[in-house]
């Protein structure tokens, strides 16, 4: 606010050099809404222009300098106000002086390191943003622009299937199998459940995808479980020897890549939870962790050299055993013949 309370004497605007052509990505905000932001990858250059728009053109505006920052930070909601910055770059755009008319200043942050994926969770937020600051003697004029960063991964070198036998002695014995342990965000989970022994009356069976967010360290560790999806496998009583196929499409759910010990502040892990409910409403369940990763999209011409190389890894050939399966439940069975 200005000295007389009539609002700031100037406004700042940030525009990206490739703003008209750059892809946007949806990202969840703190209030749960989805908004679109400019999408960047690790290693890409961030460039643009900061414009100082005077509220009263012709009237001189004194300032103590203009700067632009590129910031990556983590905010833990239980520790509001204490931001942990893991990327902090700054460029001075104008020295202290006077401005008498609206003026624009170009900036460029070359091949910027963006090591983590943007994330908004239950107890933590990881964000990247540009912040322009026009320093003034009384109150600074500040403008921020958020961007979204996606981290790309290569095909896992090892991606073994998951096969387990679980049960209750002399009551229930089942074998479940998933075709892989690592899935990209638009993958399909293919598997089967085989009933070896059934002496209790099962009336319902489902698979849940559970996201577990862990924040903090030491005594200040918080766990937040969120059921992302519920997939009904069967509704009715199974019999011994029955085999039930599983085919769960991940593309329809709001998922992120698995994140482990991000900047020693938080982790995000995913689990498949097999749930059985008997006629007396007793619940039996077995959890199995899976790894989620983001598959690269088609390389955009405007990407920097580093980001292009990272994305091209996806488009090249992969080992036969790591290539995604497309043959349905039969692929699972063949792996264990």
Curated annotation (Swiss-Prot):
Disulfide-bond pairs as recorded: none
Disordered as annotated region, ranges: 313-337
Cellular localisation: Cytoplasm; Endosome membrane; Early endosome
GO biological process: intracellular protein transport; retrograde transport, endosome to Golgi
InterPro entries: Arrestin-like_C, Vps26-related
General function of this protein: Acts as a component of the retromer cargo-selective complex (CSC). The CSC is believed to be the core functional component of retromer or respective retromer complex variants acting to prevent missorting of selected transmembrane cargo proteins into the lysosomal degradation pathway. Retromer mediates retrograde transport of cargo proteins from endosomes to the trans-Golgi network (TGN).
The protein's name in its UniProt record: Vacuolar protein sorting-associated protein 26B-A
